[in-house]
Design a protein with these regions (language model features):
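Extracytoplasmic copper-binding redox domains, predominantly the cupredoxin/blue-copper superfamily
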Residues: 21-264
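Sec-dependent bacterial lipoprotein signal peptides
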Residues: 1-19
Length: 264
């Protein structure tokens, strides 16, 4: 009887050990402790630090508005001194273009809280048409290239005045239809023509992913802005600069009005 009992005990122990081994073999392998490589942000996307003031995952909204001038303003004209067959006799002064209801054209609006990394993939065009820079104010992202065209077929001279970017002064004769320059740092840059002294324009190099230039009715619009609280800045070559706080809510339109008076 004792031998029989010993044999049964041995069989029982072997069965238990076999069951334990089977369970160990079916367990999932342990996860590696090595870190997962980070995914690089898409070119031109706002940086992580730039999004600190927004609410990721909470949606986007829109910012619209107008820039208005309060006060009286006389419409100015600029006489043309040469090449009148192309330039004409005179033109309206573009440095302060105001509509009948005070609408301010060519004001630059941007969200200053948000930044994006430079991207050399962006290109913009600044043309010279009837001895005017078109557009009068051009906004580009940091790292962009500007193609300066000469649609007039006469001699022009493109002369920039800047502090952070390399200034250039290049003749553009009628056969040179295009020249290109890259702007690597955020800055407001004045553009002049030494041949035609009345020609003036601006290149605004912005590191914000959200900017606009007001149209003739003084309006601007920014779409797909992440939810959050921001500082909205407006700049105008004659009226100056001011800021205003805004809050963007998911699926909503935030309307903002900027009012200027003539600086004393």
């Amino acid at each position: 009887m004792s031998a029989s009992r010993s044999f049964k005990r041995l069989v029982f122990v072997l069965l238990v050990m076999a069951a334990g081994c089977s369970k160990d073999e079916t367990r999932a392998p342990a996860k590696s402790s090595e870190p997962t490589p980070a995914t690089a942000p898409a070119p031109g996307a706002p940086t992580a630090s730039a999004r600190n003031n927004s609410s990721p995952g909470q949606g986007v909204g829109m910012i619209t508005g107008k820039v208005i001038f309060k006060g009286t303003h006389a419409v100015g004209k600029v006489p043309m001194g040469k090449d009148k067959e192309v330039c004409g006799d005179s033109k309206f002064d573009p440095t302060l273009a105001i509509g009948s209801q005070g609408e301010v054209k060519n004001a630059v609006i941007q969200i200053v809280d948000l930044k994006r990394p430079p991207s050399s993939a962006n290109e913009a065009v600044l043309d010279q048409v009837k001895c005017e820079y078109v557009p009068h104010v051009l906004v580009i992202p940091v790292g962009a290239t500007v193609k300066v065209k000469n649609s007039d077929g006469i001699l022009h001279n493109v002369h920039t005045f800047s502090e952070k970017n390399i200034a250039f002064n290049r003749a553009q004769p009628k056969y040179m239809k295009e020249i290109s320059e890259k702007f690597a740092k955020p800055e407001v840059i004045s553009v002049r023509c030494d041949v035609h002294g009345w020609m003036s324009g601006w290149i605004v190099v912005s590191e914000s992913p959200f900017f606009d230039v007001t149209s003739a009715d003084g309006s601007f619009k920014m779409e797909n802005v992440p939810v959050g609280k921001y500082t909205l800045e407006v700049w105008h070559e004659t009226l100056g600069k001011t800021t205003q706080s805004v809050e963007v809510n998911a699926g909503e339109v935030t309307n903002v009005t900027f009012e200027f008076q003539m600086r004393k």
